[in-house]
């Protein structure tokens, strides 16, 4: 496991940024890429959809809803069976994280037009490089 039994938020964003950078490079080369590490907010998903389009790749948001009880059962089982590959999550943490999650709506799931970038950013690439500090703002020259 990368960070022992901890979940350091300052490191997670750096790792995710590198995964996004690598994945987009693979997509540029014409291979399929699946990102599966949360995307808790519409802005995260919109930025990645936009960047995928900028590199000439097709993107699709897939959402598999899960109720709290089943999620808690899976989290507990994962820690019990493979503690070296995960970290402990309390009920309070799990509830806080569930409350932060923004489920995709039907338009997002259909792949509708990507919403405008939040007003404090010039491009989705800029937004993404601030969200994931290790992701370079290399797509800024492409239209927003």
In which residue ranges do the predicted regions lie?
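Short catalytic-loop micro-motif centered on adjacent basic/acidic residues
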Residues: 33-36, 61
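Conserved substrate/cofactor phosphate-moiety recognition/catalytic segment
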Residues: 1-31, 77
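NTP-dependent small-molecule kinase module
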Residues: 99-144
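Aromatic/hydrophobic pocket-lining residues that form π-stacking "cages" and hydrophobic walls in ligand
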Residues: 22-23, 48-50
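Loop/helix-junction capping segments adjacent to catalytic residues or to phosphate/diphosphate-binding pockets
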Residues: 42, 69, 121-122
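A glycine- and Lys/Arg-enriched "phosphate-lid" helix/loop adjacent to the NTP-binding pocket
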Residues: 3-6, 54-103, 140
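Short glycine-/polar-rich loops that comprise or flank the Walker A/P-loop
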Residues: 29, 55-60, 106-112
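Acidic, metal-coordinating catalytic cores used for nucleic-acid/nucleotide bond scission
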Residues: 36-48
């Amino acid at each position: 496991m990368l960070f022992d039994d901890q979940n350091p938020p300052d490191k997670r964003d750096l790792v995710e940024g590198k995964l996004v950078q690598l994945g987009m490079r693979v997509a540029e080369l014409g291979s399929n890429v699946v990102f599966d590490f949360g995307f808790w907010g519409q802005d995260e998903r919109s930025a990645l959809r936009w960047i995928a389009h900028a590199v000439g790749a097709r993107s699709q948001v897939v959402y598999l809803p899960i109720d709290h009880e089943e999620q808690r059962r899976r989290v507990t089982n994962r820690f019990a069976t493979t503690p070296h590959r995960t970290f402990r999550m309390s009920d309070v943490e799990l509830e806080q994280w569930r409350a932060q999650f923004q489920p995709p709506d039907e338009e997002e799931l259909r792949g509708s037009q990507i919403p405008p970038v939040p007003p404090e950013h010039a491009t989705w690439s800029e937004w993404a490089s601030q969200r994931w500090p290790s992701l370079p703002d290399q797509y800024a020259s492409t239209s927003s």
